[in-house]
Amino acid sequence: MRRCPCRGSLSEAEAGALPAEARMGLEALRGGRRRQPGLQRPGPGAGGPTGRPEGGGPRAWIEESSLHSEAERTDLEPAPCPNGPQAESCGDGHAECEAAGLVVASEKPRQNKELDGSNLQTHPRRNSPLVEMEMAGSWTDGFRTDLHRSDLQSRPKRASLCTQPGFDESWTELDRSDMWQTLPERDNKPRVDNLRTHHGVSKLQTHPVCLSPESSADNSGKELSADASRTPHDTDGFWIESQTDDSLKGPSTQTACRQPGSDGFSSKDTESALTQPGTDGLRDDSVLGESNGNDPLDLSEPGELVTNLCSHLECSSLCPVPRLIITPETPEPEAQPVGPQSRIEGGTGGFSSASSFDESEDDLVAGGGGTSDPEDRAGSKPWKKLKTVLKYSPFVVSFHKHYYPWVQLSGHAGNFQAGEDGRILKRFCQCEQRSLELLMGDPLRPFVPAYYGMVQRDGQAFNQMEDLLADFEGPSIMDCKMGSRTYLEEELVKARERPKPRKDMYEKMVAVDPGAPTPEEHAQGAITKPRYMQWRETLSSTSTLGFRIEGIKKADGTCNTNFKKTQALEQVTKVLEDFVNGDLGILRKYVARLEDLRETLENSPFFKTHEVVGSSLLFVHDHTGLAKVWMIDFGKTVALPDHQMLSHRLPWTEGNREDGYLWGLDNLICLLQGLAQS
């Protein structure tokens, strides 16, 4: 075999030992480029046709760029050689060996001494016609193409050759000259910490180059938003920088990058035109791969050519992301998906307590079917509107709510389901249906949820009502049970006639006060529902103030329903003050709304002729200053006998049907007024 041309020329005797076919091929390829005896090829700093002037003149292959494509030039150009003192002579002899088919590229390319395992070296580009031609963006032979093979053998390239030794190894680079010489190396070259790699494929791929239009004071251009994550979209191939974290969300075949010094961003696509940076337009290039999004990309100086290779191996697992359709018509458009808007579990919550005769207002749940333990559900579901905003300059794309399981502060699990178009579905109760239908024509209409009739879903009937939280952003919610009693007189009569002890009521009583049940109830291990409800009201502010706080959920997601023993005036005042975080503006709005409600109740024909038991006031406010109060839960609101009317302020005795609603409302307004004035 013939020795490597880097080690010198062969003697005539050694050359004669080669096969005739090799000699013929060697002579044919040498052509007119063979050097005269005694003459040496000029070095990188020398002038001449094969050398390069000191000032950085054009390279020898500039004239061929308009005649041959990249794939065609690979047969005429030398294979890369390692750095060393023989680099110049190797460039000539190695090309001859490769042309004769006698040299095969190594499967493991030699690592450049000036590279560490994670850096991609960049070379300065002189002020030459080549640079001007490349910056002009109109190449006669189109984009550069590289033939990636999985075996990494026989891969001649014009500029650089990057191979992947293995999945866990660093990428190496063989950077050599395009024709007969090596580019001058610099001692203090900035490294590209953000190493980018390509997966090798067995077909031609288009590899673009990114030109940095300007640099910073330390001669290094940097990509913007280096800490932003890049999110791939399945088939559209766009990268969206949400600027929220440092994670990389999976591979893609195209990358959107922002060029320094431009107001717009550069979205790279293989069929898009070039727009020069420094304008508000979009700069489009062609690229394959993606960035790891952890470190900025450093360039050594203006006008330098950088080939960015992206690694698919350092990516985190793919996460499902909605597909976006982005249109650069306006600086910050807001796109909304087609379909009805509603609520989601993490967004808003329900406003109901028990609302049927066989339900207890003490059956507390959270999360639309979760546990009744306050500790289990405290802070588990934040009360804020679900609004995912993905920002990528100059666009703002937001996604609003679709469907959500209803979240309750109190009441039985499964009472609510998500509706459509800003509505909710509450389990059907004929008493509540009749009350809501009458309230739609009563002066109380602005203080109750709108009613849209009965609907069927999955074989069950539901009352369809307005979602009262639709206009709030991250609301804080409080449920106050109004009145001096929360049970109907009919329930007492029924319990006497057909007592039905319940084990669950006994367990609830013992959980609050183990000494509350009588010895007989302890022995039986069960109590009736009216017995439990009467006992419960003696513990809370229902018996002392005419209302009690059922539950509170703050904007930060914390939930508290442990108000069973909140009875003293000072305790209730403290809870109310904490609910509004001492915001006097919110307090004044609540007071004004409650005063309007009281005036309307006193003039309402419906209210005068109905026993309102177990109903609640729903308090809602948010960070924007919006604050409202509504009457909810009419499952135990029943009509009075003919010609009977209630004052709603007198104490209750069995038979007078007084509920103490206005008595409790008067006390609540007085407490809030005191807080607002203090």
From Swiss-Prot:
Q: How is its activity regulated?
A: Activated by calcium/calmodulin. Inhibited by high concentrations of the substrate Ins(1,2,4)P3, and allosterically activated by the product Ins(1,3,4,5)P4.
Q: What class of enzyme is it?
A: transferase
Renumbered to this chain, motif Nuclear export signal spans 318-326
* Subcellular locations according to the entry: Nucleus; Cytoplasm
Write the lineage as a comma-separated list.
Eukaryota, Metazoa, Chordata, Craniata, Vertebrata
Q: Could you tell me which residues belong to the region Calmodulin-binding? A: 504-512
What is the recorded name of this protein? Inositol-trisphosphate 3-kinase C
Gene from which this protein is expressed: Itpkc
Enumerate composition-biased segments (Basic and acidic residues). Answer: 61-76, 107-116, 173-196, 220-236
Q: Which organism is it from?
A: Mus musculus
Binding annotation for ATP: K426, E466, D467, L468, D479, K553, D633
